[in-house]
Amino acid sequence: MFRILSFLCSWILIAFAQPDMSWFFSLLGSAVGYGLLWYSLEPQKSPKLSWRQLTSLLFLWSVTVYGVHFSWMLSDLYVGKFIYVVWGVLISLLALLFTAFSCLLFFIVRKKHTKILWCLPGLWVAVEMVRFYFLCSGMSLDYLGWPITANAYGRQFGGFFGWAGESFILVATGISFYQVLLRKCFSRYVWLGCLLFPYILGGVHYEYLKNTFSKEENLRVAVIQPASSMLLEGPWSGSPAMAWQRLVSLSSIVRKPVDLLIFPEVSVPFGRDRKVYPYDDSQVILSPLTHFKHQDELLANVDWMQALSNHFNCPILMGLERWEELDSKLHLYNSAECISQHGELIGYDKRILVPGGEYIPGGKIGWSVCKKYFPEYALSCQRIPGARSGVIEVENLPKMGVSICYEETFGMLLRNYKREGAKLLVNLTNDGWYPSSRLPQVHFYHGILRNQELGMPCVRSCHTGITVAADALGRVIKMLPYETRYRKASPGVLQVSLPMQNYPTLYAFWGDFPMIFLSLLSIGCIGCYFGYRLLAKKEKA
C-alpha cells in the first residue's frame, strides 16, 4: 500500500512542481518527489517488478507528467490540430529519456554498483544538454531542475552553476532521498546537504546583494503592450496605416521624459523598409501625437519609428520583420530594430528560431515531407537565423542585450551579452500563438532566471504575455495584466524607473563549462567502471 501511495504522491508532486503553478509543490516535489517514485518501483523488497513492468510504469508516469507540464501546447486556435502530434512526440521523447535513466538507476541499485551511483546526476545533465542545445533549435523549457527556482534563493543559485547546476542538484536530492527510504547509512545527511545546499548558497548571496543594492542609477523605460497581434489577427479593412493606430494611441499615454521606448516582437506587418503606408492616411493617425519629418508619398515602418523617436527625444526599440537579398535570394529575419533621435538604425536578427513556426526542421528533406503530407503547415517563407550581435549600443544609453521570443531562456546565449558589456536585458515576445494557456507564465518564469544568473536587470515587451520590468535580483518593479485561461490581456503602457545596478556572477564568468566537465567526467567514470568489470569477467572466463 505504501508503494502505491508513494507512486501516486510522486506523480502529484512532480506534475504540479512548476514555478508558474505552485511554489509549494515545486519546493516539496524537488525535495522528495523523485525519491518517492523510485522507491515505489524498486524498494529492494519482494515482490520485485519485472523490467517490463518497471519500464511500462515509468513511461506511463513520465509521459503523463510531461503531458501536464507541456499542456500549454494544446491551445490550437492558431497553430492547428497538428500541434497534438507535436505535443505527443515531444512528451514521448522526454518520457523515454527519463525512463531509460531511471532504469539505469534501478540496474545500479539491484546489482549494488554503488561506486557509480553518484555519477548519475552528471549523466542526467549530459542527457539534458543534448536536448537543450541539439534537439532542433534546442528545448530549454521544463528542464528537471526548474522547480528549484520557485523562490529567490533557488534562482540565485543559478548565478553560480546555471540551469545545469539546478538539474544536477535536484537529481542528487532525488537519489539521496531514495537512499533514505532504503535506510542506507548516512543517507539522511546526504539528502539534507543536497536539499539545503542551493538555498543556503543562493540565499547568502541574495541577502548580501539585497543589503548592498543601489538604486542611484536608473533608466526611464516605457514599454507598449498592444494586447493584440496583427500577425495573428489577420487582414483588416481600410488603409495599411491602421496597423499603427493602436500603437500610436498607446504611445500618447507615455509621459515625458523617457530614455527608451520599447515595442514587442513583430509589432506591425510589412517589414522594416517596405514603403506601403500612404502619407495622408498615416498623418491622420499620427497627428494627435506628432508629425512626420518628410512628406513622401509612401512611408515605411522606420519612418513611423523615427517620428516617435523625434517626439519623445529617445531611441525606439521595436520588433519587425526584415528582408535581405543575398546571392539573388530573399532572406527573412525576425528582427529587433533600434532607431535613435539622430536617425541611427541598429538591429539584431533572431538566432534561435522556433521549429515549425519559423522554419521546418530537417532541412530540404523535412520541408519536402511537410509540403507533401502536411501542406497546410508548409511555411511559404521560412525565416533564417541571424548573425548580427544582440548587443545594441545607442548614444546616451547603456548597452542593451536584446533577445527575441524564447531566446531569453538560453543562459549561454545571453551570457555572451554580459561578456560584451551589456548592462540591460531586453526581450521582445509574442506569446499569443497559444492563447488562453499557461505559456506566458511558463515563458516568464524561465526568462526571469537570466537576471540572477547574469546579475542584470531586464525588460520584457509582449503583445499578450507578461510585460514586466525587473531588477538584477529578479524582483518585479512593475508588471502589466497578461492573458491567462480566465482573462484577456489589457492594452497598456508600462512606464518605470528601472534600477540599473549590475553585479558579477560566476555563471557569467564560466557558463555551463563546469557542468559540462562534470558531465563528461561522470560519463567517463561510468564507462571505465563497466569497462573494467567487463574485462575482469573476460579474464576470469
Curated annotation (Swiss-Prot):
<feature type="transmembrane region" description="Helical">
    <location>
        <begin position="116"/>
        <end position="136"/>
    </location>
</feature>
<keyword id="KW-0808">Transferase</keyword>
<comment type="similarity">
    <text>Belongs to the CN hydrolase family. Apolipoprotein N-acyltransferase subfamily.</text>
</comment>
<dbReference type="GO" id="GO:0016410">
    <property type="term" value="F:N-acyltransferase activity"/>
</dbReference>
<feature type="transmembrane region" description="Helical">
    <location>
        <begin position="506"/>
        <end position="526"/>
    </location>
</feature>
<dbReference type="Pfam" id="PF00795">
    <property type="entry name" value="CN_hydrolase"/>
</dbReference>
<comment type="function">
    <text>Catalyzes the phospholipid dependent N-acylation of the N-terminal cysteine of apolipoprotein, the last step in lipoprotein maturation.</text>
</comment>
<dbReference type="GO" id="GO:0042158">
    <property type="term" value="P:lipoprotein biosynthetic process"/>
</dbReference>
<protein>
    <recommendedName>
        <fullName>Apolipoprotein N-acyltransferase</fullName>
        <ecNumber>2.3.1.269</ecNumber>
    </recommendedName>
</protein>
<dbReference type="InterPro" id="IPR003010">
    <property type="entry name" value="C-N_Hydrolase"/>
</dbReference>
<comment type="pathway">
    <text>Protein modification; lipoprotein biosynthesis (N-acyl transfer).</text>
</comment>
<feature type="transmembrane region" description="Helical">
    <location>
        <begin position="189"/>
        <end position="209"/>
    </location>
</feature>
<dbReference type="InterPro" id="IPR036526">
    <property type="entry name" value="C-N_Hydrolase_sf"/>
</dbReference>
<feature type="active site" description="Proton acceptor">
    <location>
        <position position="265"/>
    </location>
</feature>
<keyword id="KW-0812">Transmembrane</keyword>
<feature type="transmembrane region" description="Helical">
    <location>
        <begin position="21"/>
        <end position="41"/>
    </location>
</feature>
<keyword id="KW-0997">Cell inner membrane</keyword>
<feature type="transmembrane region" description="Helical">
    <location>
        <begin position="89"/>
        <end position="109"/>
    </location>
</feature>
<feature type="transmembrane region" description="Helical">
    <location>
        <begin position="157"/>
        <end position="177"/>
    </location>
</feature>
<feature type="active site">
    <location>
        <position position="350"/>
    </location>
</feature>
<dbReference type="GO" id="GO:0005886">
    <property type="term" value="C:plasma membrane"/>
</dbReference>
<feature type="domain" description="CN hydrolase">
    <location>
        <begin position="219"/>
        <end position="500"/>
    </location>
</feature>
<feature type="transmembrane region" description="Helical">
    <location>
        <begin position="54"/>
        <end position="74"/>
    </location>
</feature>
<keyword id="KW-0472">Membrane</keyword>
<dbReference type="InterPro" id="IPR004563">
    <property type="entry name" value="Apolipo_AcylTrfase"/>
</dbReference>
<dbReference type="Pfam" id="PF20154">
    <property type="entry name" value="LNT_N"/>
</dbReference>
<keyword id="KW-0012">Acyltransferase</keyword>
<feature type="active site" description="Nucleophile">
    <location>
        <position position="405"/>
    </location>
</feature>
<keyword id="KW-1003">Cell membrane</keyword>
<keyword id="KW-1133">Transmembrane helix</keyword>
<dbReference type="InterPro" id="IPR045378">
    <property type="entry name" value="LNT_N"/>
</dbReference>
